[in-house]
């Protein structure tokens, strides 16, 4: 029965478990050896021993399976990872099962195995245990080696990555270094050029600094010369009286060296500002001498004063005005004013920047107009302009002085005049005389030297003592036509071409000059127009006005002949007719001027035509009898006799009184007889200022310039 049960258990165990055949075969082999070795062994003991061993192996296998299942449920990931390293089931089933003492006693009591068999079994179990331990150690070593290999591979990969990164960084650094080297090479290649440029710039700056120093010295020298010339000119004209020792004081006060560029510019601007103020004072005061000192001139006429005394009194009065203006200008200069700053605008040439206040202007001046190449060039241009204007001014001053000296000489050959003068002709001649001197001068407000304004050396108020001078002016003005116009224009050609100044010639004279300058002595109307605009800057504006006047003069005067030729209609000059009409005497017009006796009602006695002419000539004084008093009756009588041409010579002492008048002398005055045209809107300054005792007439001291006359005279 026991054998059958053992066989059944073995068969069941073989059917239920895999891999037990090897174990059973080993046990069978061991049992065979035991049977062969032991004589007392039996079949029942061997079978029981096998049964026990199989049970132990099954239990051990079950325990291992349970442990694997529990460990798989707890950590399936770790089990999956460690599957290739797990011990096979066959080996796990061979795990030794320790035989308890009770089991040993049962085996001994039942006498299943002999002691020798038990020893052999125990030895086998120990051997199996050793094998299992060796296997476990082997598998552990393999696992450790695998772990180490994995770690080494990971480390190698990391090292490779790091090496790659380092290589990339090294490559980038090498590229950057190469780029830097290339840039340095390029810079080194360009560096010699830069050094040369820097050296050139330094040399240029040094040259500019030297030029600026020379230029500053030239400016100081020019300023000194200009001040000396200005003082000398004023001293010559009698405007100021300076002792010889004091003439050099302003020049000596100028510093010679140690000035900064800003101080030199400030000095230049201050001096030019003072000169411009003085120039304006002389310009505005030159023609207003009689109005500023009307009381002194009136008293001089009643007290039988001579013209030179009156002249000196006027000049002395004017010098006081100039001194006052000079003092006021110096106060303005010290009061934070500036020549280059006015009305919130910078007056530097070509700048015109808007500055809100004086501080902003100073910042603008120091920043934009510092001592550099551009400012130096602009200053040089201004110096050239000033030099040209000074040359022109000196020429004009000499010419004016000669004219004044010449015109105020006493007449030597009085000529009789059978008929009274034409009033319009005398007024025209006086006006033309005044136009030839002051209005032909260039107006140069920017020049540091003051232009000399013409100052009449005789009294402006017409007195019996001044009537011979007026006669001389009339005669000299009529003789002027014997002088060729080319000699008048040639020296001032550039001035008239560039300056907007009216030429002191009639349209007929200008037309004749244009025709005479042409190659074939004939011009078309358009060619005459082009000559006017080309020669005079004054005719480049108001074309409609003066072109009408040119056409009117061409058709009016017989000396201009219209000829038809291939070009069309051209104009020529008949010189015989031109000279004949100039030398022709005026016959007079009795209806225009009547012989009116001297009385207090002189203004009321003027006829309608005379009053109309005076009204057109802006002379309300003579047409208003209320302004005439007893003190000026002799003066008005002299004016009346001069306008009628009955006076050309009076006693050299100038004896005159309100009660008596000198004997009229008959003279022959060469004046062109022409119809009255709208030329007489201007009038001589001497007539404007007659009997000027009222301040209401001070606004009429400067009369606006009108277009040129449309007649010959």
Swiss-Prot record:
SMART domains: FH (SM00339). Residues 1-45, 279-337, 436-463, 647-666, 676-713 are annotated as: Disordered. Keywords: DNA-binding, Metal-binding, Nucleus, Repressor, Transcription, Transcription regulation, Zinc, Zinc-finger. GO terms for molecular function: DNA binding; DNA-binding transcription repressor activity, RNA polymerase II-specific; protein homodimerization activity; RNA polymerase II cis-regulatory region sequence-specific DNA binding; zinc ion binding. GO terms for cellular component: nucleus. The keyword Metal-binding applies. Residues 386-407 are annotated as: Leucine-zipper. The keyword Oxidoreductase does not apply. PROSITE patterns: FORK_HEAD_2, FORK_HEAD_3, ZINC_FINGER_C2H2_1. Residues 502-592 bind DNA. One of its GO terms (biological process) is caudate nucleus development. Signal peptide: none annotated. The leucine-zipper is required for dimerization and transcriptional repression. PANTHER family: FORKHEAD BOX P, ISOFORM C (PTHR45796), FORKHEAD BOX PROTEIN P2 (PTHR45796:SF9). This is Forkhead box protein P2. It comes from Hylobates lar. The gene is FOXP2.
């Amino acid at each position: 029965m026991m054998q059958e049960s053992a066989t059944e258990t073995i068969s069941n165990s073989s059917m239920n478990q895999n891999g037990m055949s090897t174990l059973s075969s080993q046990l069978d082999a061991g049992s065979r050896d035991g049977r062969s070795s032991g004589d007392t062994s039996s079949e029942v003991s061997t079978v029981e021993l096998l049964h026990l061993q199989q049970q132990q192996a099954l239990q051990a296998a079950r325990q291992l399976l349970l442990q694997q299942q529990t460990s798989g449920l707890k950590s399936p990931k770790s089990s999956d990872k460690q599957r290739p390293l797990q011990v096979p089931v066959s080996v796990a089933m061979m795990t030794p099962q320790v035989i308890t003492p009770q089991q040993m006693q049962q085996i001994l009591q039942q006498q299943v195995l002999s002691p020798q068999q038990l020893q052999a079994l125990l030895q086998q179990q120990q051997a199996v245990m050793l094998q299992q331990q060796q296997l476990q150690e082997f598998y552990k070593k393999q696992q450790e080696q695998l772990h180490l290999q994995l770690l080494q591979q990971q480390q190698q990969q990391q090292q490779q990555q790091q090496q790659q990164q380092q290589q990339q960084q090294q490559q980038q650094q090498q590229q950057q270094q190469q780029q830097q080297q290339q840039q340095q090479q390029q810079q080194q290649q360009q560096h010699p050029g830069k050094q040369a440029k820097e050296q050139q710039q330094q040399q240029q700056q040094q040259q500019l600094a030297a030029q600026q120093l020379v230029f500053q010295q030239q400016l100081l020298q020019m300023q000194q010369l200009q001040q000396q010339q200005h003082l000398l000119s004023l001293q010559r004209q009698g405007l100021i009286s300076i002792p010889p020792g004091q003439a050099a004081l302003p020049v000596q006060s100028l510093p010679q060296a140690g000035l900064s560029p800003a101080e030199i510019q400030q000095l230049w601007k201050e001096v030019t500002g003072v000169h411009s103020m003085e120039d304006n004072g002389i310009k505005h005061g030159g023609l207003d001498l009689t109005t500023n000192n009307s009381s002194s001139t009136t008293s001089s006429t009643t007290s039988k004063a001579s013209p030179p005394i009156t002249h000196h009194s006027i000049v002395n009065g004017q010098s006081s005005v100039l001194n006052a203006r000079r003092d006021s200008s110096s106060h303005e200069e010290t009061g934070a004013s500036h020549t280059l700053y006015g009305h919130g605008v910078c007056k530097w040439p070509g700048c015109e920047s808007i500055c809100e206040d004086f501080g902003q202007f100073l910042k603008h001046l120091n920043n934009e107009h510092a001592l550099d190449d551009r400012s130096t060039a602009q200053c040089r241009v201004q110096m050239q302009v000033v030099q040209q204007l000074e040359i022109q001014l000196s020429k004009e001053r000499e010419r004016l002085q000669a004219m004044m000296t010449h015109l105020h000489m006493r007449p030597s050959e009085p000529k009789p005049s059978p008929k009274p003068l034409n009033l319009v002709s005398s007024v025209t001649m006086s006006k033309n005389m005044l136009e030839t001197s002051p209005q032909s001068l260039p107006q140069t407000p920017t020049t540091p030297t003051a232009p000399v304004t013409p100052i009449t050396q005789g009294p402006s108020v017409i007195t019996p003592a001044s009537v011979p001078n007026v006669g001389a002016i009339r005669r000299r003005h009529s003789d002027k036509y014997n002088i060729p116009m080319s000699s008048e224009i040639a020296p001032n050609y550039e001035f008239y071409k560039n300056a907007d100044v009216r030429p002191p010639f009639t349209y007929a004279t200008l037309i004749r000059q244009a025709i005479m300058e042409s190659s074939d002595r004939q011009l078309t109307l358009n060619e005459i127009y082009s000559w006017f605009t080309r020669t005079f800057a004054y005719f480049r504006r108001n074309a409609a006005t003066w072109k009408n006047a040119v056409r009117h003069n061409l058709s009016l005067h017989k000396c201009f002949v219209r000829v038809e030729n291939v070009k069309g209609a051209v104009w020529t000059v008949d010189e015989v007719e031109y000279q004949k009409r100039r030398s022709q005497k005026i016959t007079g017009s009795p209806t225009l001027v009547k012989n009116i006796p001297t009385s207090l009602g002189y203004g009321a006695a003027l006829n309608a035509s005379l009053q109309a002419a005076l009204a057109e000539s802006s002379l309300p004084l003579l047409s208003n009898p209320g302004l005439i008093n007893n003190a000026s009756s002799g003066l008005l009588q002299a004016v009346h006799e001069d306008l009628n041409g009955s006076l050309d010579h009076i006693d050299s002492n100038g004896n005159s009184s309100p009660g008596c008048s000198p004997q009229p002398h008959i003279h022959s005055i060469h004046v062109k007889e022409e119809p009255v045209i709208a030329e007489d809107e201007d009038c001589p300054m001497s007539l404007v200022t007659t009997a000027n005792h009222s301040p209401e007439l001070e606004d009429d001291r400067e009369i606006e310039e009108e277009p040129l006359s449309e007649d010959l005279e």
